[in-house]
Amino acid sequence: MGDTSSLAPSAWPWLVFIAAVLAPFAMSSGGINIAILTMLFIYLSVAWNIVGGIAGQFCIGHSLFLAAGAYTSTLLSLHFGVTPWIGMFAGAAVAAVIGVLIAWLSFRYTLPPLSFALVTLALAMLGYLAISSIDLFGASRGLTLPVRGTPATYQFGADVWYYVVIALHAIGAVALSAWLYHTKVGLYLRALRDNERAAHAIGVPVLRYKMLAMAISAALTALGGTF
């Protein structure tokens, strides 16, 4: 066996990346499905971490943003023929607006962390009840897209390509999160997480950056909803 100790540290992420992308091509159907779900949850975890980890705001209503992405892109595809590759960004915009509104209503009145968490959970449940009751959203039946089997409609002939798509989503989310962490925005968000009063005292616009964190996290989550 070769000596891997001579590999530069910077080479390891690339090796892991190549292995992660190529591995499913040698897996069984069941293994690919597990890999797809694993990558999806990695992606959603990174999306949640922007508001819950970096900014320190414990939101447990991200299923609402996931639904916003899924239903927006699906409705646009069913009624207007918009490809999900475009509809997913419309869903991200809708989720970002919802996230900003939730953050504005919650943080403008300085809700404590536990109350904010419960508000987001309650709104997610209300969203579920609304979707389950409105015919436009398919009510309890849900919505069904016609099977076209073309990449342009976000449908692929082999499951492995779904893995490739969600793996690229996850890699992009990790890269975005890592970049954001080291920017001025990331510095402000960490300041809010560590000591909100001190951050406010030195001039950090608390409400604005909490809303921004919520918007970014919601938009990324919605992209996963389209998937």
Place the predicted regions along the sequence by residue.
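Transmembrane alpha-helices and adjacent helix-loop boundaries
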Residues: 1-227
